[in-house]
Amino acid sequence: MQCALYDAGRCRSCQWITQPIPEQLSAKTADLKNLLADFPVEEWCAPVSGPEQGFRNKAKMVVSGSVEKPLLGMLHRDGTPEDLCDCPLYPASFAPVFAALKPFIARAGLTPYNVARKRGELKYILLTESQSDGGMMLRFVLRSETKLAQLRKALPWLQEQLPQLKVITVNIQPVHMAIMEGETEIYLTEQQALAERFNDVPLWIRPQSFFQTNPAVASQLYATARDWVRQLPVKHMWDLFCGVGGFGLHCATPDMQLTGIEIASEAIACAKQSAAELGLTRLQFQALDSTQFATAQGEVPELVLVNPPRRGIGKPLCDYLSTMAPRFIIYSSCNAQTMAKDIRELPGYRIERVQLFDMFPHTAHYEVLTLLVKQ
């Protein structure tokens, strides 16, 4: 992938950009095999990759510069701002949005937040696009509600320029820290969720719900999990750390009982909406802590699917699963180091199958799907 920002030394986020994709995949596979070297693996499936540029469905832009000439991008460690509107990871459809946002920031008087001076209002612009219909969600992260009335007043101009903006919100993040969002979300549009569709499964994206940033690879990840589950004798499963329900909604059949657990209530609202659309009445999604939910249960289903954050599932859940011994565990991980650590805490399970998904090209990161079977 050619990147003028990288070539000019202005951005180093894609540290592997000079390596061809096959070399990147080989290095990631070697890393994964090294991490799982202590465990016999019955089947290594071929790694899955997607487009090498224009694949991201989300932009998280730090707003800097002045209200008349805002910059959208990032801050270097020394505080120097960098405009990243031309980043080739973003699809071409993002360019006109960035182009319209810059004059809009001036029109609405949204002074960019100055980290050094702790002054200003507009901290971040968060943009998400649906692959299914091209609809977009735009979030303005502000320090306070001071400029909210001005923003509302100027908004019709922006909506006229960009009719693809289906969901627009203001998020209030009052703390002087590099935290992307606060708890308060103010909707400026009637529509509150973005419709997405992977493999004929309706999914919903709400402002404060996690959603995979590489749809081409994520849809293959979910489809693979579905294929693996369909090969197993499973009538009841848990989907822990389920997010908007991507795994559970793909894996469920009309006669299967499924419980999905996720701490974020916004994500659970999305999952429930999808389940209702699919007419799956035996799916239950609850906004709870996954570990606390699981360890309070007196029995387990045949299959437990886990998709934890980077820290992994942790010892308490590993101990519980070891004791309760579900027949199958499917572990989806964005951090193979913590996954390997967790598998060590699951004695009595063998690794039936492993597959790497290149969700983050040009970086050392990857996603991995692992099927564990009770010995």
UniProtKB/Swiss-Prot annotation:
Residue numbers annotated as active site: C334
Role: Catalyzes the formation of 5-methyl-uridine at position 747 (m5U747) in 23S rRNA.
EC number: 2.1.1.189
Binding site for [4Fe-4S] cluster: C3, C11, C14, C87
Protein name (database record): 23S rRNA (uracil(747)-C(5))-methyltransferase RlmC
InterPro entries the record matches: 23SrRNA_MeTrfase_RlmC (IPR011825), MeTrfase_TrmA_AS (IPR030390), MeTrfase_TrmA_CS (IPR030391), SAM-dependent_MTases_sf (IPR029063), U5_MeTrfase_fam (IPR010280)
SUPFAM superfamilies: S-adenosyl-L-methionine-dependent methyltransferases
Gene that encodes it: rlmC
Any one GO MF annotation of this record: rRNA (uridine-C5-)-methyltransferase activity
